[in-house]
Amino acid sequence: MNLKIIKTDDGSDTLYNKKLDETYHSLHGSVTESKHVYINAGLSSVIDENSKGPISILEVGLGTGLNLLLTLKFAKKNDLKIQYHAIEPFPLDNSILKKLDFNNKLEGFDKKIYKKIHHPKNLEPVKLSEHISFTKSITRLEQISFEKEKYDLVFFDAFAPSKQPDIWSKENFKLIREAMKTSGVLVTYSSSGKLKKILEELKFNIEILQGPKGKKEMTRATK
């Protein structure tokens, strides 16, 4: 098997991809990292701008679904309506999914909802809760015809640029930018020089923020 479950420092699980020699999340804590990058620096930052309507989120790299689980929890707590579209060309096998453990770090973790996240039909909307409508595209980002100016927020959570550089291409970020609303926000754990250069060339407003534990910096970019 190409994937191995690893317990991270905050007690939550992540996956190690042997082929890429890369983990899905930080070994310092998968929940800790995802909450810092995608919820605190991402979702929290767009609430005021979208208080009167649903927030539209695009995630590049659904992976274990952890960012979506944290979004579900945040949406319930803050009574938000969210339309969530995730791209994942390589969905995880059920034999791995059923062994992943987030119970100890995610209060109210619902296995029925988790099953819906990982087994919806391609592009068929699924209502995960009264707060979130979810769509999953089982394909590569560059193969999607995006609606223009649709997304308020983008979670870019693909494998590292050093491992899968093609995903971090200027062409892909151009597609994403066109799909973002004016003042839309993109957040990612990466702060690589190549990423900064691409975002600058595409006229994003870039903020280099403090990273989660074990990582000095992360990136937030606004259209």
Positions of predicted regions on the chain:
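Core SAM-dependent methyltransferase catalytic element
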Residues: 202-223
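Glycine-rich SAM-binding Motif I of class I
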Residues: 65-69
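A short SAM/SAH-binding and catalytic strip from SAM-dependent methyltransferases
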Residues: 152-166
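Rossmann-like AdoMet
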Residues: 1-55, 72-102, 106
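A short glycine-rich, Lys/Arg-flanked "PGG" loop and its adjoining helix->strand segment in the class I
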Residues: 166-183
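S-adenosyl-L-methionine
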Residues: 96-147
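Conserved beta-strand signature within the Rossmann-like core of class I S-adenosyl-L-methionine
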Residues: 155, 182-190
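Conserved S-adenosyl-L-methionine
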Residues: 61-63, 88
